A protein has these predicted regions:
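Acyl-donor (CoA/ACP) binding surface of acyl/acetyltransferases
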Residues: 1-33, 65-171
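Conserved GNAT-fold acetyl-CoA-binding loop/helix
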Residues: 32-52
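Hydrophobic alpha-helical core bundles mediating ligand binding, dimerization, or RNAP-core interactions
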Residues: 22-27, 47-54
């Protein structure tokens, strides 16, 4: 059977990824460009603290951030984090994997649409993000600007309980 051109996307837990890979990923200036809260340098200690904090979200909320693999290779991290009463979705890809954003997002949103705790997700994007067409095509709507840790973000909301056409169940 011929294989499609899209890689096989897997979601694994962050502790499954070597800390050195996380440090290299988060130290890439192309990644840092759109992360205004990333004002510090990453090293092994910072990566270990990051993984521990994200795992604490899993313990507290039963959901959190994953590491993403494409054909078994680490390509980034992201997922859902509870912010007050809302579930925020974040995605931080390695520059070589920027084209995998939609397949990964669709797979995550299909997961969210099956979870009754998540009637909608929010997306917080820095104003430096200009290409927002994919977000709009998914059905996300702009709900305003918000301040997070003293930094301005654009906030979008996407209903996860809507028609299946809005959120594809395949990656």
């Amino acid at each position: 059977m011929p294989r499609s051109s899209q890689p096989i996307i897997e979601f694994v837990r962050l502790p499954d990824i070597p800390l050195e890979e996380l440090v290299a990923h988060m130290s890439d200036p192309r990644v840092r460009t759109h992360m205004p809260l990333l004002t510090f340098s990453w090293d092994l200690e910072m990566a270990a603290k990051f993984v521990a904090a994200k795992e604490a979200c899993w313990q507290r909320d039963g959901l959190g951030h994953w590491a993403f693999l494409a054909d078994g290779r680490y390509v980034g991290w992201g997922g859902f984090q509870k912010e007050g009463e809302e579930w925020d979705f974040g995605l931080v890809l390695h520059p070589a994997a920027f084209g995998l954003g939609m397949p990964i997002t669709r797979k995550a949103l299909a997961f969210a649409s099956e979870d009754p705790r998540i009637p909608f997700v929010t997306f917080l994007l820095p104003p430096s993000r200009r290409n927002l067409g994919a977000l709009r095509r998914m059905g996300a709507r702009f709900i305003g600007e918000t301040d997070y840790d003293g930094t301005r973000f654009l906030k979008y909301r996407l209903e996860t309980s809507g028609p299946v056409g809005a959120v594809s169940r395949t990656a």
